[in-house]
Amino acid sequence: MIKNVLVQAGDLEFGKKNNLNYTYIGTGSSGYGTINSELDNSFDFKKGSVALSRTEKKNTEDSQFFILLADAPLFEGEYSPVGKVIYGLEVLQKVKYNDKVEYVLRPDFINTFEMLK
């Protein structure tokens, strides 16, 4: 999490609720391989936007994603957008954050979500 900017989730390797690995959380993968970037310059990265996370290199997207807590026009054309949060964004504003380089001992988790067409 970057306070007041974004919340990141989706580390299926090291971020599982029942098997957290604080040393590597945020660096894991899904085990299914990466996908190519699908950059859409017309997508407005506004508060509530959801996009796939990646390494510094493009075409390395996997299971991790982020949700913006504020507008971020610098992300346009840089990250693969997948949608927008239409309900519940206020809950993400309450996600625990630690100002130090320490992990929150009891992190918050996304237990359920629903994708709408």
Residue ranges and their predicted role:
Residues 1-117:
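Cyclophilin-like peptidyl-prolyl cis-trans isomerases
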